[in-house]
């Protein structure tokens, strides 16, 4: 009997551990993929025909971003593109459970066709050290020129270093020695709208009707149920506010439709930027160097010739 109880206990413990492991894997995956996966699941291309990056559909506030990189690169060369997402690292955002926490950052980098994430064996130790423990992925398996990352801790990675490999027109017939645009989208903090159109708890909530607030019920797990006596039809409307936003109204107050019931807890935002890069022809560079060298030599010979002429003139005057 005792052996049977021990067996049952071990069986239950094994099941419990398995469930906990699965929950950990699922929640970890959903958090780590939260930023890119929303866009990846809903949009074939992260940049619309208007030039707008689709992340702006969920991250409504506008914030600055910046990108730094070389003005020109040679073919088949690894270079770094530095994405800067500045914000006050002391700020806290509303998390999904309504509590306050640190902000994460994420970014999407849209490179010209042919440019791609550098393979690990081509990344120099200097660039690898600047990258830290960042993990990049392609927006689509067949879209190697579009790279996404995030969310990652903003306090540690307000600057993201992307290792990029330039194409070689000698082997890639689609690549040409031209000037190309690079597009960037970067965000800090959570979004306000989910891809299905529903609101997150990181945004302002407004009244759905005009009337008097007859009751405010605080839920056990956080958030509020706000009952409004509708003055237009005499009925009642119940507005739900999730945990996170702070109420701005009180019981007995007269409110109007679309009047904010809460503050706007969002402290993050999304921004777009762009840059240009030239895929430089090595022969053109060599030609330019030869031209500059010839100009310098010509100047030297001209100076020497002038001095020689002055000496001849001086000798003739002495005669």
Swiss-Prot record:
GO terms for biological process: photosynthesis. Gene3D superfamilies: 2.40.50.100, Cytochrome f large domain, Single helix bin. It is a single-pass membrane protein. The keyword Flavoprotein does not apply. Residues 1-34 form the signal peptide. GO terms for molecular function: electron transfer activity; heme binding; iron ion binding. It is found in: Plastid, Chloroplast thylakoid membrane. Binds 1 heme group covalently. GO terms for cellular component: chloroplast thylakoid membrane. PROSITE patterns: CYTF. It comes from the Eukaryota. Its cofactor is heme. Keywords: Chloroplast, Electron transport, Heme, Iron, Membrane, Metal-binding, Photosynthesis, Plastid, Signal, Thylakoid, Transmembrane, Transmembrane helix, Transport. The chain crosses the membrane at residues 285-304. Heme binds at residues 35, 55, 58-59. HAMAP family: Cytb6_f_cytF. Component of the cytochrome b6-f complex, which mediates electron transfer between photosystem II (PSII) and photosystem I (PSI), cyclic electron flow around PSI, and state transitions. Belongs to the cytochrome f family. The 4 large subunits of the cytochrome b6-f complex are cytochrome b6, subunit IV (17 kDa polypeptide, petD), cytochrome f and the Rieske protein, while the 4 small subunits are PetG, PetL, PetM and PetN. The complex functions as a dimer. This is Cytochrome f. The lineage of its organism: Eukaryota, Viridiplantae, Streptophyta, Embryophyta, Tracheophyta. The gene is petA.
């Amino acid at each position: 009997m005792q052996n049977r109880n021990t067996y049952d206990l071990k069986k239950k413990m094994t099941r419990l551990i398995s469930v906990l492991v699965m929950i950990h894997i699922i929640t970890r995956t959903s958090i780590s993929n939260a930023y890119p996966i929303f866009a990846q699941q809903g949009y074939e291309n992260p940049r619309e025909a208007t030039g707008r990056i689709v992340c702006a559909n969920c991250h409504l506030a506008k914030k600055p971003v910046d990108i730094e990189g070389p003005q020109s690169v040679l073919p088949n060369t690894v270079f770094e593109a530095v994405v800067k997402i500045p914000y006050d690292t002391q700020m806290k955002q509303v998390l999904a459970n309504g509590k306050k926490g640190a902000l994460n950052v994420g970014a999407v980098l849209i490179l010209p066709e042919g440019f791609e994430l550098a393979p690990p064996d081509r990344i120099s130790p200097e660039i690898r050290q600047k990258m830290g423990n960042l993990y990049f992925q392609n927006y689509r398996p067949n879209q190697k020129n579009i790279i996404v990352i995030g969310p990652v801790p903003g306090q540690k990675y307000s600057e993201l270093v992307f290792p990029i490999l330039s194409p070689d027109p000698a082997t890639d017939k689609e690549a040409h020695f031209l000037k190309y645009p690079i597009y960037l989208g970067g965000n800090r903090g959570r979004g306000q709208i989910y891809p299905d159109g529903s609101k997150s708890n990181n945004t302002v909530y407004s009244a759905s009707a005009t009337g008097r607030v007859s009751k405010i019920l605080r839920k056990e797990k956080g958030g509020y149920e706000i009952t409004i006596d509708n003055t237009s039809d005499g009925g009642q409307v119940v507005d739900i506010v999730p945990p996170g936003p702070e109420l701005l109204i009180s019981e007995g107050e007269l409110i109007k439709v679309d009047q904010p019931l809460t503050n706007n807890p969002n402290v993050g935002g999304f921004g777009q930027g762009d840059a240009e890069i030239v895929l430089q022809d090595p022969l053109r560079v060599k030609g330019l160097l030869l031209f500059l060298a010839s100009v310098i030599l010509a100047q030297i010979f001209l100076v020497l010739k002038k001095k020689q002429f002055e000496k001849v003139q001086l000798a003739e005057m002495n005669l």
